[in-house]
Amino acid sequence: MQYNFDEVIDRKGTRCAKYDERIKKFGTEDLIPLWIADMDFKTAQPIIDACKKRAEEGIFGYTSRPDSYFEAVQNWEKERYDWCPDTALMSWSLGVVQSLTAIVRTFSHMDDKILIQSPVYTEFWDIPDMAGRKVLANALVEKEDRWQVDFADFEEKAKEAKIFILCNPHNPLGLVWEKEELQKMIEICHKHHVLVVSDEIHSDLIFHGKKHLRAATISPLAKETVITCCLLYTSDA
């Protein structure tokens, strides 16, 4: 279908969080709101039509998720990442932040330590804190024009951690992890019995000839160690 990417839509005053919450969050409207994953393109017409068709049914009760729902995700993964995840192991949630929150609360206890890599998306700090967990930050280091893992520090902190929240690809650094980096982080976590939760929400926004790798597909160890969290609408908004 044809799409007009040149159409400019003024979203100010439409209860759009991206624009209408600038004063509350930042104290000024004189800024470009890059803080939220919300594009300014109009939703594609087939999606609008599908929403209208559903709304015309007039009843908005509890909706089941048919097998085709999970099969669509499986087909997406096959096509883009050469991965065929078992639909029986898939779980639906409202979003990645909600998934991370549920996983932290389910697989750790009060005062347990959660490993993250800074600088990173602010929710990685907030989710453990709000759940009464403690954050361990493995600071990424800039070396040879690229951000890299300080593996000595990573392993020391992994010895204390219950869960490692991996940002893959990394937000905000735009870092696409190499296979060897993912393997090493997962091996260290497996060695120290640390659950790896891989936030892969930006996996479909890869540039410069890079290839995104699902952390769970890296090795047999990864299958035992990694929970993958992904979301289609952030990259296709």
Show which residues each predicted segment covers.
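A secondary-structure boundary/capping signal
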Residues: W35-A37, Q117, L231
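Residue-level marker for buried hydrophobic side chains located in beta-strands
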Residues: N168, V196-V197
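Conserved small/polar residues in nucleotide/adenosyl-binding loops
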Residues: Y233-A237
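Walker B catalytic acidic pair
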Residues: E200
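A structural signal for short, well-ordered beta-strand segments and their strand-loop junctions
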Residues: P33, L115-I116, V197
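N-terminal small-domain helix-loop-helix segment of the aminotransferase-like
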Residues: Q2-G95, A102
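Conserved core of the PLP fold type I
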Residues: F60-E187, D204-L205, G209-P220, T225-T228
